[in-house]
Amino acid sequence: MAGKSATVGKKWVIGMSQCTLAEPWRVQMDADLKKAAAKYPNLKIIFKDAQNSVLKQRAQIAEFVQSGVNLIIVSPKETAPLTEPIAKAYKAGIPVIVLDRAVLGNQYTCFIGANNTAIGRAAGTWIVHTLHGKGNVVELEGSMTSSPGQERNAGFQQAIKGTQIHVIYTADMKWQQNIARREMESALTRFPDINLVYAANDPGAYGAYLAAKAVGRAKKIIFVGIDGLPSEGLAYLAQGYIDATFRYPTCGRHAIAAAWKILHGKKVPKHITLSSRMFTKANLKDGGQPLP
């Protein structure tokens, strides 16, 4: 009873370090965190943007520890470099929720994310089916120093193994639309026969589409992305720019729900895996199809 009364009226401060706000998906994550936190008047979130810098993000986590926040939420830029500062915060007694990109080891309170390998595998399976098991594919990877980039690639490669799907051009577009467009321009110059583009996120798929459209080849190429934001991937799909996208939840509301429990002394799972959906032109109006 004493423990419960001690939390009544208490103000909680959460430090949130976002690796970058240059990606629309991450802007939406912060918006979802803010919206979910607004339901709890005792919660205050301090948002920080690491501006795509590992050093800045490491410093931000250290600042949160020094300022004595009650809980830290981190969406890491890269896996290995963020492991140490997150572990230090955790060992200092501050709960840490890691979103989207995993870190090494288990020195954190909770990880929340969807299964990127399963999403990549589902995308690969759809690609094999759509191309009838053979064709030339351009793969535009996400940052391969991050777990989502690695896992979306791994799942895709698992699905196409043993088929006649040939990845004729691969590039790390670092989640950025402009880099994806530039890489696709190179692929189009080198290869006259491209059947499909598999991009690790929707901005990458859209960047590839723009490159192909500029040279009159977009109608002959299938474009596949990941994220499935209503304002982005689903809009691209509805307008015919891309052909399929796989939803990766922003984790925002789930993070706040977990944070609230943790701050009140309740246990949460070490890993919370969120569900995903596949969207195509055929099922968009029906809300997509859940992944198995």
What label would you give each PLM region?
Residues 1-292:
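A residue-level marker of the well-folded mature domains of exported/periplasmic proteins
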